């Protein structure tokens, strides 16, 4: 039987594009693991995707994952848009290249290793897991900007 894992992810950007960070909080059997990082010049959508990718990459064996995001972009991309992007060779309905296709392809690869249930929550309304992921993403931004945390 595979482990059940909750994964809360978020991305943040100071300027868009600008310095950005991603955060992921993994919860399995009451044990929590925090992950975060950042990039000097990126977008909020790239950081949202990276949070989900890095969280899933951290799982060393197939798991049943409930992935919680406050990003409509990630949620709709993975659950609605991706199937058609793939059919069209990573092009949009307007025949334009899919933005962030490199990250969407990495996310698709990671999702294929697990059973993932996607859950969207409204951001910044006090959802504990989402708030923690937001704090981690902002830590990633701060580290890129040279701001240290205790």
From Swiss-Prot:
The keyword Heme does not apply. Binds 1 Mg(2+) ion per subunit. May bind a second metal ion at a regulatory site, or after substrate binding. Its cofactor is Mg(2+). GO terms for biological process: DNA replication, removal of RNA primer. InterPro entries: RNase_H (IPR050092), RNaseH-like_sf (IPR012337), RNaseH_domain (IPR002156), RNaseH_sf (IPR036397), RNaseHI (IPR022892). One of its GO terms (molecular function) is RNA-DNA hybrid ribonuclease activity. Residues 1-142 form the RNase H type-1 domain. Endonuclease that specifically degrades the RNA of RNA-DNA hybrids. This is Ribonuclease H. It comes from Pseudomonas syringae pv. syringae (strain B728a).
């Amino acid at each position: 039987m595979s482990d059940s894992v909750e994964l809360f992810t978020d991305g943040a950007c100071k300027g868009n594009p600008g310095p950005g960070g991603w955060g992921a909080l993994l919860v399995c059997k009451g044990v929590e693991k925090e992950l975060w990082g950042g990039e000097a010049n990126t977008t909020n959508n790239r950081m949202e995707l990276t949070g989900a990718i890095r969280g899933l990459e951290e799982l060393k064996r197939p798991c049943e994952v409930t992935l919680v995001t406050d990003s409509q972009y990630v949620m709709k991309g993975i659950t609605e848009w991706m199937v058609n992007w793939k059919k069209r060779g990573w092009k949009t309905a307007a025949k334009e290249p899919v933005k962030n296709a490199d990250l969407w392809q990495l996310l698709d690869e990671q999702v294929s290793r697990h059973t993932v249930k996607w859950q969207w929550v409204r951001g910044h309304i006090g959802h504990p897991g989402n708030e923690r992921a937001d704090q981690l993403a902002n830590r990633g931004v701060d580290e890129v900007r040279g701001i240290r945390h205790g």
